[in-house]
């Protein structure tokens, strides 16, 4: 049996960053972080992340850190950093491995990101995930419980922290190895693979709070704002060439229709087949001068033009033509407005894939204009569905995966109690919906109530996506969609 610190040191050496001769050195470096009291505790624990948690507890007892989530996270990341190579070494390892097997290189990087606790697998496991059958196929729902909520002590401590603009944002290269602070996440164990996209240097990393398998982030090495251009399509198609089996997509570059970070140009990707990818063509056509590109409208709640070709350059040229036309296209009959004075409203959410040597590009048309009736956005979740989802509909939601707020875990449980006629604390904003469900399921029982509520939450998410779709799934909506397609030019 070994002491907990010796156990930790042995596990660190197993990862190959240090040799047997480094044992004393590593132990002393760990002691500098956690203190020297309580280190004789015997442990046969083999899980490195669990041992790390024990060492953080020792550091807390020794007064090396305060009892704040952020300080524990910072120390935890510092301890796990012992198993992660320096950025230069890791990039050498990755690209050397890539030359032999791209798939193996990616798998090794993903494994390291999990093993080092950069990807918060334990926290992610807390999420509630389910699927819901809709007329658009099965949609995926996640109630996001993974990110720790701030406690009162942390909120109080934040007020005492001086403002700083370093790192500039959560997506900057400056985060690599950053210790973290009270109001900023720990990144000591964070590493970024450098890659060239065209003439630009970009970074490839994983999301610490993944929403799907191998949830990757690709970030510009420079702190430049989101911008959907021809270069966006080019870079997304390049990513799917570099990383076999990955999709790559971008949030749009305008508020309301975009993601939460517009200040730093980035894409997302991963190894996951989203519901939208499974959706079939509703109608197919041929764009003029692009007879070699298969094209059509996808049967989906949002407005999607899908392009398919083995020729990447042809796909790029057609996508650019569609984007340029959409930027200036208005159709007042269906409330589609490209510009208000000098303010642009039109952009796209693009998603690239490569399947069996064939490139596929989904172009989701977006419009962010507002009216008095819809101050949050004409093509944003409307008031009657905001009890489930009121946040922006970004890339992940567009593809059919709802990321719902933590409040919905207890709130949906209360909706279930309401349907059963039990004592409950149902939120006022769920009442109208719950009454509709009561009417729809008059004889609901305890065994089925949870699955019924989840299924119906999925139907609301489908409506959320319909609200965000610029062309509605009606005969007049389809007719209007085809007016735009014809304006681009079809045979």
UniProtKB/Swiss-Prot annotation:
Source organism phylogeny: Bacteria, Bacillati, Bacillota, Bacilli, Lactobacillales
Keywords assigned: Carbohydrate metabolism, Cytoplasm, Galactose metabolism, Nucleotidyltransferase, Transferase
Keyword Secreted listed: no
Pathways involved: Carbohydrate metabolism; galactose metabolism
GO molecular function: UDP-glucose:hexose-1-phosphate uridylyltransferase activity
PANTHER family: DUF4922 DOMAIN-CONTAINING PROTEIN, GALACTOSE-1-PHOSPHATE URIDYLYLTRANSFERASE
Keyword check for Cytoplasm: yes
Coiled-coil residue windows: none
Pfam families: GalP_UDP_tr_C (PF02744), GalP_UDP_transf (PF01087)
Catalytically driven reaction(s): alpha-D-galactose 1-phosphate + UDP-alpha-D-glucose = alpha-D-glucose 1-phosphate + UDP-alpha-D-galactose
Protein name, UniProt field: Galactose-1-phosphate uridylyltransferase 1
Species this protein is from: Streptococcus pneumoniae serotype 4 (strain ATCC BAA-334 / TIGR4)
Top-rank taxon, per record: Bacteria
The family this protein is said to belong to: Belongs to the galactose-1-phosphate uridylyltransferase type 2 family.
């Amino acid at each position: 049996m070994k002491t907990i610190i010796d156990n930790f040191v042995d596990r660190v050496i197993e990862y190959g960053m240090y040799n047997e001769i480094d044992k004393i050195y590593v132990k002393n470096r760990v002691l500098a972080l956690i203190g020297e009291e309580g280190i004789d505790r015997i442990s046969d624990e083999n899980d490195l992340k669990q041992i790390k948690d024990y060492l953080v507890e020792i550091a807390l007892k020794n007064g090396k850190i305060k009892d704040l989530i952020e300080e524990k996270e910072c120390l935890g990341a510092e301890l796990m950093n012992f198993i992660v190579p320096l950025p230069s070494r890791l990039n050498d390892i990755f690209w050397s491995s890539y030359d032999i097997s791209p798939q193996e290189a990616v798998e090794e990087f993903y494994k390291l990101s999990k093993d080092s606790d950069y990807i918060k697998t334990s926290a992610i496991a807390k999420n509630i995930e389910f699927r819901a059958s809709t007329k658009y196929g099965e949609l995926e729902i996640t109630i996001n419980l993974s990110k720790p909520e701030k406690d009162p002590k942390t909120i109080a401590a934040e007020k005492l922290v001086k403002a700083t603009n370093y790192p500039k944002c959560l997506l900057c290269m400056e985060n690599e190895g950053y210790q973290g602070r009270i109001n900023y996440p720990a990144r000591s164990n964070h590493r970024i693979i450098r890659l060239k996209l065209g003439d630009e240097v970009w970074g490839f990393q994983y999301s610490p709070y993944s929403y799907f398998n191998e949830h990757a982030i690709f970030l510009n090495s420079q702190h430049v704002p989101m911008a959907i251009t021809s270069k966006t399509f080019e870079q997304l198609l390049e990513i799917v060439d570099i990383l076999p089996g990955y999709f790559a997509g971008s949030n749009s570059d305008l508020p309301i229709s975009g993601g939460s970070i517009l200040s730093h140009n980035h894409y997302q990707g991963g190894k996951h087949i989203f519901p939208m990818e499974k959706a079939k063509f509703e109608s197919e056509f041929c764009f003029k001068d692009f007879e070699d590109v298969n094209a059509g409208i996808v049967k989906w709640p949002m407005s999607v033009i899908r392009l398919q070709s083995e020729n990447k350059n042809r796909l790029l040229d057609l996508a650019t033509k569609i984007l340029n036309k959409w930027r200036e296209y208005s159709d007042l009959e269906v409330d589609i407005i490209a510009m208000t004075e000098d303010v642009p409203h039109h952009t796209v959410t693009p998603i690239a894939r490569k399947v069996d040597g064939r490139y596929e590009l989904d172009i989701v048309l977006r419009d962010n204009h507002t009216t008095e009736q819809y101050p949050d956005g004409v093509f944003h979740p409307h008031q009657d569905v905001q009890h489930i989802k009121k946040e922006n509909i970004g890339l992940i939601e567009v593809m059919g995966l709802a990321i719902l707020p933590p409040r919905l875990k207890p709130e949906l449980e209360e909706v279930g109690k309401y349907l059963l006629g039990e004592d409950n604390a149902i939120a006022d904003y769920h009442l109208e919906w719950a009454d509709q469900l009561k009417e729809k399921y008059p004889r609901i029982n305890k065994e089925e109530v949870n699955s019924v509520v989840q299924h119906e939450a999925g139907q609301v998410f489908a409506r959320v996506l319909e609200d965000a779709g610029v062309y509605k799934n009606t005969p007049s909506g389809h007719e209007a969609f085809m007016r735009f397609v014809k304006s681009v030019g079809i045979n």
